[in-house]
């Protein structure tokens, strides 16, 4: 019989760098239409916060049993604190570059009967200190076996080529999860 084995995720620390965001959900019942506009009124009964974007990638890596490290950009606010707490509870070592002048990106979904009624985005692209982010990443590369770049076009990976070159100089494989508009990674860039 053929013997299958799972990879040893616990022996491959992974560094995720990218656009972190908070996915916030408000759940409630709808029982009437608003008199102000033809929209349902939701009476919020519960809410939940989940790591989104690159933070969700790191969360999934940790769930597989790997040591997950995360570098990203947030505001200095309640949403960033919620993200940090959720990630810490899941075993993710999150290191945020916190910016005073901008809020953490939040995607708020209003749900009723397991149906999304509305999504509200609280975001503006981050104007990051790309050099400082690169220093943070380079200081962690000695601890990891894989670098994952998770780009949602929100500004954290403005200087992705520097990160790729630093990883390749250490023979660390780079995986890219580009969702942004301009993310040209080609194999010939070695």
Residue ranges of predicted features:
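Ribokinase/PfkB-type carbohydrate-kinase core domain
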Residues: 1-31, 43-190
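Peri-catalytic substrate-binding/gating loops that frame the active-site cleft of hydrolases
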Residues: 35-42
